């Protein structure tokens, strides 16, 4: 809940923080956004992470947390796509869209640098999950990357690319994922591909 999330992100004993928290349970409208750490200071939200040549992204990123229960504990052993993830509320999405649009404009953040924890740490993190509104953020708020849907519809009628493991690794790494192109379809590569699909094909 909101109170637990605030305590988790502000009490030093937990060793985790974020620049912003978007609550869930408040009846205030529009939904308030809590700034917990100044933009100019480091927050501890990404942990061991990488995007392109940058590692340890706490030092170079703004962290936004959204109160969400994720999935029930009994779904832990199920594949990610079979888990019953909690949807985000429309009030949360509106608050997130307004906040991220402001931050993107203020700091001139490119679309492909608006990322999930699962993008920058795919072997450790699954948030914000399959219900995160990437498409809505891109199309309605101008935030983040989303494919051109007309071009996407055309590509769906073409044969799937016959890339081997190295081909997939090279393309994932080129986009930004922390994948070492080795030609071996290892867990690092599988996790990066899952993260890419979670972002663009939830």
Pin down the residues of each PLM region.
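Active-site-adjacent loop/helix surface patches within enzyme catalytic domains
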Residues: 1-112
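Secretory-pathway/luminal and periplasmic proteins that interact with or process carbohydrate-rich
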Residues: 2, 122-131, 199-202
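Acidic, His- and aromatic-enriched active-site or binding-groove loops in soluble protein domains
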Residues: 21, 130-158
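Second-shell loop/turn segments in exported
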Residues: 50-51, 80-92, 123-124, 154-161, ...
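Helical (often loop-to-helix) elements that flank the catalytic cores of nucleotide-handling enzymes
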Residues: 73, 85-86, 124-138
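Short acidic, glycine/serine/threonine-rich helix-capping segments at coil-helix boundaries
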Residues: 156-202
């Amino acid at each position: 809940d909101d109170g637990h999330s605030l305590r988790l992100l502000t009490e030093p004993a937990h060793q985790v923080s974020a620049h912003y928290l978007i609550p869930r349970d408040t009846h205030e409208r529009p939904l308030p956004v809590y700034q917990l750490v100044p933009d100019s200071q480091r927050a501890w939200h990404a942990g061991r992470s990488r995007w392109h040549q940058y590692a340890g992204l706490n030092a170079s990123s703004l962290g936004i947390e959204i109160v969400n229960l994720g999935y029930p504990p009994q779904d832990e052993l199920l594949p990610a796509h079979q888990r019953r993830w909690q949807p985000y509320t429309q009030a949360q999405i509106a608050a997130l869209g307004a906040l991220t649009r402001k931050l993107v404009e203020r700091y001139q953040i490119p679309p492909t640098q608006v990322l999930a924890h699962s993008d920058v740490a795919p072997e450790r993190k699954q948030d914000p999950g399959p219900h995160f509104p990437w498409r809505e953020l891109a199309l309605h708020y101008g935030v983040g990357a989303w494919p051109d849907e007309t071009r996407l519809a055309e590509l769906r009628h073409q044969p799937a690319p016959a890339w081997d493991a190295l081909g997939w690794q090279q393309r994932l790494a080129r986009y930004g994922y922390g994948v070492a192109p080795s030609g071996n379809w290892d867990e690092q590569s599988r996790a990066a591909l899952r993260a890419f699909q979670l972002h663009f094909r939830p």
